[in-house]
């Protein structure tokens, strides 16, 4: 039977519960255990698919087409285990399912209440699909004391009693702020956070304390005494240079050993940290550096591009170099010369996005890369803008545009209305709801045998994750090909363009999918490894 680890947070948000969960999962894997990680999100949205990136950050898409929290990206990157739709749930989705049951009469006339109906739905979610797994790590979003989170805290409290003894523990992540004027770390915020947690019936077994310095022995003793935990269970979570050093740091602090002790697992299997050591050797000893410009529209919040940032770092690891990112708001190119911002960079990446704002700036970035022979990587919207630029500048389609921006005489990019999901035909229309109506999840693509992208993958059949509502119009395929822009990848039925590449260019590739979602520190995605290698070559020319 699986053992359950519940990770909660206190004092302030954004302390890194997702990263802590992922790191602990990786440490348990290093000891030979199997893990599954899940995230409970207290907000009322069904999923983050329609939320602003500035509100929520990145939407992480799973193979089975779920739009989920960005923490699931951490889970995948650290453990290598693909996340699924059933690894993330929100209050909105729970309420939606409960109300649907009530309308069907499933509750047989009972009064539907938070306890037991909502809490039971949460418990059912946590316990489902865990056969054959040694540990299930469950992260609860938000901080203790949030009104939205109360049903989730009540549910995990009940689970602590429902499960057999020594099958559930609670880890509480808190902040130990350093007060310069006093010259010391303060434990009172953590004490109050634990007091709040205990008031709803949860006694943490382990405290994971975020800090930028060593926790003195006296402060550990104080936290153990007033928070009712063992002194050895007060774990120091120091800031580190790279997120990929977190597993090693937490192991050195004794987190995984304390978790196994809390479950009564002794003697504990010794961990194999060799692959984490190998990753960090590459991070700490780069043999060069390249600068990549990310030309986007959500550059004010880096979490909007979390998987992209990590995939570029993985590409750097593959080439043993450091990747420096220049963040550029695409709108500036609509009034300023792109050369001022791009002359010094070694590669240009235009990521996914939605809407007309900043689109012309992305088109200008693609033009700069094409004309100056700078490596260009267009992802999703970035591929579409590159095709529009090529249609206008190379194929003579002066009015080329996307129907996403309004009616156009030359719809080089248009709304997808039909596509196949396995054996099922998916149909969408302009008036469809925004939520859950995109082409989502993993789809296969066929690559042209002698194309650059097929050489990069070392294969002609691939599967990648998608999240888009618009597509490049195949009616323009021949005109573009005549001018050196080829559709190197198509859906298996040949109807949907998946990749484009420019023939007369050292590295100019656009993809309709999101390869960043499948990159891992131990297995850098081949497209990012190749893109960074091309940028390295460019750095020797500049």
Swiss-Prot record:
Residues 291-541 form the Glutamine amidotransferase type-1 domain. SUPFAM superfamilies: Class I glutamine amidotransferase-like, P-loop containing nucleoside triphosphate hydrolases. UTP binds at residues 13, 186-191, 222. Residues 1-265 are annotated as: Amidoligase domain. CTP binds at residues 13, 146-148, 186-191, 222. Pathway: Pyrimidine metabolism; CTP biosynthesis via de novo pathway; CTP from UDP: step 2/2. L-glutamine binds at residues 54, 353, 381-384, 404, 469. The active site is at residues 380, 514, 516. It holds the Pfam family GATase. Keywords: ATP-binding, Glutamine amidotransferase, Ligase, Magnesium, Metal-binding, Nucleotide-binding, Pyrimidine biosynthesis. It comes from the Bacteria. Allosterically activated by GTP, when glutamine is the substrate; GTP has no effect on the reaction when ammonia is the substrate. The allosteric effector GTP functions by stabilizing the protein conformation that binds the tetrahedral intermediate(s) formed during glutamine hydrolysis. Inhibited by the product CTP, via allosteric rather than competitive inhibition. GO terms for biological process: 'de novo' CTP biosynthetic process; pyrimidine nucleobase biosynthetic process. One of its GO terms (cellular component) is cytosol. CTPSs have evolved a hybrid strategy for distinguishing between UTP and CTP. The overlapping regions of the product feedback inhibitory and substrate sites recognize a common feature in both compounds, the triphosphate moiety. To differentiate isosteric substrate and product pyrimidine rings, an additional pocket far from the expected kinase/ligase catalytic site, specifically recognizes the cytosine and ribose portions of the product inhibitor. Catalyzes the ATP-dependent amination of UTP to CTP with either L-glutamine or ammonia as the source of nitrogen. Regulates intracellular CTP levels through interactions with the four ribonucleotide triphosphates. Homotetramer. Belongs to the CTP synthase family. This is CTP synthase. It comes from Methylocella silvestris (strain DSM 15510 / CIP 108128 / LMG 27833 / NCIMB 13906 / BL2).
